[in-house]
Amino acid sequence: MSKNVSAIKKNQVSLRNKRKNKSYKSAIKTLIKKYINSLDELMDLNNTYVCTLKLSAVYKKIDQAVRKGVLHKNQGSRKKSMLAKAMKISISRIKTI
């Protein structure tokens, strides 16, 4: 370990940021999994309003992560696009039944 004070502080800051970033990413992954799992249940009830509310909550968390620099803006866009596509597919599946 370094004895230089600035190097020690820099290491502490990087570890702190790593923990924060990991918790943000974990929260996003958890919300995405919950949303994907709830899509089938909500579409069985034909409740698109609740689906859009849950989708907006996930979008909000992704946008916050992009704003804070945890995710790159392109990665955030890809995640949001994937979620919208999943919702669209599940809605079309319900309409065909």
Swiss-Prot record:
Superkingdom in the source lineage: Eukaryota
InterPro entries, sorted: Ribosomal_bS20, Ribosomal_bS20_sf
Record family assignment: Belongs to the bacterial ribosomal protein bS20 family.
GO molecular function: small ribosomal subunit rRNA binding; structural constituent of ribosome
Compartments, as annotated in UniProt: Plastid, Chloroplast
Function field: Binds directly to 16S ribosomal RNA.
GO cellular component: chloroplast; cytosol; small ribosomal subunit
Region annotation Disordered: where it falls in the sequence: 1-20
GO biological process, one term: translation
Leader sequence segment: none
Biased composition (Polar residues): 1-15
Disulfide bridge partners, by residue number: none
Record's keyword terms, sorted: Chloroplast, Plastid, Ribonucleoprotein, Ribosomal protein, RNA-binding, rRNA-binding
Organism annotation: Gracilaria tenuistipitata var. liui (Red alga)
Name this protein carries in UniProt: Small ribosomal subunit protein bS20c
Primary location: plastid
Name of the coding gene: rps20
